[in-house]
Structures are given as structure tokens and as C-alpha cells.
Amino acid sequence: MAATAVRPITGMLRRGLILDIGIALGVGFVMANGYWYGYHMPRTNARDNYYKKLEEERAARMGA
């Protein structure tokens, strides 16, 4: 049998690796933004509004 040349697969691996990393970073960025603006910020704003209301009620009771 004749020895056949085998094509190097390094280019395919590099392209696949770059694609995988790009997709992972993109999906991670979307998920992080979804968490940050969909859960974290609304909860933080609700907490801040609650304590602001408590402080205003306390100030009104103290007559300040």
C-alpha cells in the first residue's frame, strides 16, 4: 500500500476552538445581562425603595 498524505487538522481545530470560545463568551454575556437587568437590578431597586419608604416614615414620625 502506498502511504497517503494526511492533511493536518490544526486549522480546523483552531477554527473550532475560536468558534467555541466565541459562542461561550456570547452566551455568557447574554446570560449575565439577563441576570443583571432581569433579576438583580429589579430586586436591588425594590430593596432600595423599601428602605427609602421606611426612612421617610421614620422621619415623618420624628417630625423632621
Swiss-Prot record:
Query: Which residue positions does the secretion signal occupy?
Result: none
What would you give as a GO molecular function for this chain, any one? Answer: oxidoreductase activity
Q: What is this protein called?
A: Cytochrome c oxidase subunit 9, mitochondrial
Summarize the subunit comment.
Component of the cytochrome c oxidase (complex IV, CIV), a multisubunit enzyme composed of 11 subunits. The complex is composed of a catalytic core of 3 subunits Cox1, Cox2 and Cox3, encoded in the mitochondrial DNA, and 8 supernumerary subunits Cox4, Cox5a/Cox5, Cox6, Cox7, Cox8, Cox7a/Cox9, Cox6b/Cox12 and Cox6a/Cox13, which are encoded in the nuclear genome.
Q: Which organism is it from?
A: Neurospora crassa (strain ATCC 24698 / 74-OR23-1A / CBS 708.71 / DSM 1257 / FGSC 987)
Q: Which UniProt keywords apply?
A: Membrane, Mitochondrion, Mitochondrion inner membrane, Oxidoreductase, Transmembrane, Transmembrane helix
What family does this chain come from, according to its entry?
Belongs to the fungal cytochrome c oxidase subunit 7a family.
The organism's taxonomy opens as: Eukaryota, Fungi, Dikarya, Ascomycota, Pezizomycotina
Mitochondrial matrix side, ranges: 1-15
* Annotated TM spans: 16-36
Q: In which pathway does it act?
A: Energy metabolism; oxidative phosphorylation
